[in-house]
């Protein structure tokens, strides 16, 4: 089974985690699958799929794939 999320370096976003379903950075998936970073004055603050380093992108990609697997198994 192919994993839904992958990470790569792009000219526009730098290191980013992408969703294979949309071929775009995984903004929606970060908001839906991962818990919010904190409940702010203007709502939930979620994780940004655009990362500074390859390591951060790899870790976020692993978290998203794990969360997606748990959701699809339910």
Q: Where is each model-derived feature located?
A:
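Short N-terminal "domain-start" leader segments
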Residues: 1-42, 47, 52-54, 58-74
